[in-house]
Every structure is written in C-alpha cells, then in structure tokens.
Amino acid sequence: MTVSAPFPSKASADTAVPQGLTPAQAAEGWLLLFDGQTAFSWDCPGKNAVREGVWHLEEGSTAWPFSRFGNHWELVAEVAGPVRLYLPHEHVLEHNGDSFDRLQVVCNGKKIRYEGKGFSRLSSVERPAGPPAATIGITAPGPQPARLRHLRLRPQQLQPLWNGRNLDGWTVNRADPKRQQARFRITDQGELLVEGGPGDLVSTVHAADFILQFDCRTLGKHLNSGVFFRCIPGQYQNGYEVQIHNGYKNNDRTQPLDFGTGGIYRRAPARRVVSNDEEWFTVSLIADGRRLVTWVNGFPVVAWEDPRPPHDNPRQGYRAAAGPFSIQAHDPTTRLLFRRIQYAPLPPRPNSHPTPQLP
C-alpha cells in the first residue's frame, strides 16, 4: 500500500518544496505532518479536503498518521473549529473556537504537557476505532468542519548511531570480496566521508522498528548512495534501502531519477525530489512494521506499506526482523558526507494496523 496524493500543479526545478519548514526547523529534525497541499501520509477514510493551505475534515471524519512516532516527541499545530485530538495515555484535547489557535504538545514517556489557548482536556471520552498504538488521532465532532494547518512534529531523545569521531560501532562489510573498493574516513570537521565503491559500512546496532535521522551532502552531481536497514546479518546490502539520489527528469522534481532521495529503492519512489546536490539535507525514516515513511528536509516523500507475504529475505517479501544498518558506497564516482546519524527504537507495537473506522 502506498499512500500518495498528486500535487495540484507541476512544480519547476527551482522550487524545492511548495510549502515546507524553514531550513533551521528542518535541520532541527522537525517533520511536516501536513504538507499544505494534500493529506499525504494520513489514514483518513472520512470526507476531507485541502483548500488554500488548510486541511478541512467534515463532521464525523477521523484521521490517523500513517506511522507511530515513539514515546518522546513535540507536536505543534494550528487548529480552528471543533476538533478533538487523541493523544497517548488517554489524553483527549478539544477545541471549539472558530479562529485558529496554536497548540504545542510535548510527550515525554508517560507524561503529556500541552499549551494552547482555546483547548480543554476531556475525560471519559471513548477513543474512536483506529490503530491502537497511534501517536495521535484527530476527529471532527461537527457540525462545522475541523480545520488544521502548520502541523509538524519533532522526534526527541534519539541516540547517536555514529559517534562523529571514529568508526567504532561500524565495520566494513567483507561479505562480498568483489565489492571492497570503498573508502570510509572521518574528516577534520567530524563528518563521515564515503568515497569510491562498491562497498558497504555496517552498524553493530540492529533494529526492526525505529526512527532514523541523518544529514547528508553529495560532493558531485547525481551521485548515488543509500542507507540500508533491517539487513540480513552477514550478507552484502540485503535489506530495505532508503535511497540517496537528487536527480530528476524533465525539469520536474516530481519525476525522480532512480527512485529519488527518500525513496524506498525498488519499492516506492519519492513523490518529490526535495534535496539538492552539493548542499546538506536531512533524511528521516520511520520503519513501523510493514509501514515505511520518509521525509527529506522535513517534507514527507514516501508513505508505503509492504504488501508482500512475510519472508526472511527482504528482496523476496516483507521482512520484519531486526537487522543492521549499512551505508552504501555505490560506485567509483561516489563521494558523499554524512553527519548526525541518530536513531531511536520504537516501542513494541500491535501485530497489525487495523483500518480506521468512522466513530
């Protein structure tokens, strides 16, 4: 399953994101939950529409994000009209004012803190049917539509996956003797330089469901790399791959070359190439069971559910098992920098994501 929505109009190559975060917000790890044009990356079976940058949910509509975000995060949104927001640990907030009010929610484990004019906490409110472990849920109790804009979230308490000083916690993949041409070294600026290829650098950390964020910069045009995850230990690049490739066709960023940065290689192309070569960009990935969601500079580019039967080999089917991460050195032209590679495991989840039903 791929949750996708076309953009209202074709965007030119000189516009990276039609509506997005500031560069500072993207660098801080913020993720757009609403792109201002579509309901991409949401399960929303009820009647809804986006008009002039505002998401309208008609009476009775329910919306859930495509993935979870763990137990530590910060949420910011602007809300108008009658809206109910369902948060972890039975917290339910209600808004009834007609004008937009800003809401900030901080989740720190089992502690929920919120600030916002026009919001009240409800008690004894039954949670509508939907994914039982969803981070947030939104309903429109009516009679007027619920309206939302500028909805974003920042995962918190991510752990370093790379220490920024040396290659402790990582090993060069020796599984294929014919693919040993890559070079991995730390620059004076504390960045990981990946050169040449083919080759592969593998983490000692294994993960199944997680949040991953990293910064990358290509040192050339249309270079190819990627980060593999849920890899089969001891094999060469046998896992899912979040692609790094900033090329696109026909002067149109909605036509990525080779799946595009943020795409899940050979599975789900990026719906838009957000990043530029020779500039730093941030890639965020959430692997939540069958559901894989990616953002580039905080802009959502993939929301894909692996429909294949379970299989230990991710090339043959859906792989749920934990495995290492690996950084790809694709070919002799490869020359990229990485920094701030960090992740957080997601808590245990239910075995499935039920289809949300209207309350």
Identify the meaning behind each predicted range.
Residues 7-359:
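Carbohydrate-interacting regions of secretory-pathway proteins
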Residues 1-4:
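Bacterial N-terminal signal peptides
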